[in-house]
Amino acid sequence: MLIRNIEQEKQACMHVNWYELFQKNTIKSCIIPVPEDVLAYLRQDMLILPKECSNFTDVSTGEGFQTTHYNAFDDQFDGSDGEEDDANEQPAFPEFSQALTDAIRSLGGCAFLKSDWHCPKDAQWITLGQSLCVRDITDVYQLLKASSFCKEDFRERSEVNESGYHIVLKKWKDIHPGSEFRCFVRNRSLLAISPRHWPSYHEHIARERSDIVNDIVSLFKEKIKDTFPLKDYVFDVYRPGKDNVIIMDFSLYGKGHSDSLAFDYDQLDDEALVATIEEEDDPEFRYLPNDCGIQPIKRNVYGFPQDFRNFFQGAASSSNGDTAGEASAEGDSNNLVNRLIEQCNLQQLHDDNQDHA
């Protein structure tokens, strides 16, 4: 049995290592190396944002774009009595923050954020619009600090991986969920295709099935198969229209690495053993042919926890009755509490609307 070198596979799937190979077939991106001091900050659990994320700072993000952003975290540390530890002092990363601002501006003022392998989808509840669209550095820092997925990417790595640590900003695009697909490659053969947002139903998929498969197969055979260095991997694509397929990402093949969505990895492995060259032109494409009713929304899995809602709502109620002399760490964090309660209310409103839709 062939022993996999997971570290080398992960390195191949890093955005920084495949972007130039497929630059003409993917979304414009800015890749920003993470300095050691920023990396140490991102690894910490503290919720202090850098000094550059100041209150009511106007951030010019390009022609026609002007963002005014209030940072609720900063007020936790205003009015310091001078006795707090150095560890609680607000950090500053002027050069890195400027690089982020310049990148967002160059991408038109809106960008999709990810680290080397993951996007902070588990933290989008913390943004005002509950979106992964970032418009300024406050959005970037808040998402990175709140995301367990990204924090995992910032952990110490094997010496095999010498590519460093990066923040990736992609030009923002409003993508219809029914136009994203996940493709499974085994032994350099395209075995299967699944809708990326399985098991959601999209009427046009059944109607355009042949065109979808043909377009993805063409991209794979002409651009990816002989270029991407791995034999087994998963890649995601976005198909905005006929004859137009855009590479979104590459990830590791197999259980524990990439969601198999409409398939099972054991089944895919069995099919790979008997696959023929001819079958590569017609990979199995699974999709819902009929509307099965309301399906669970995966985004809600990463929504604001109900326990947290109860805790912060209780903290806010008790803080309203505190006197100045009774203020504690909870009282010092009122601005954060209010911020999180606001997110609770926004999500509750969204959930209620979904229930009545």
Model-derived segments and spans:
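Preference for protein termini
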Residues: M1-A357
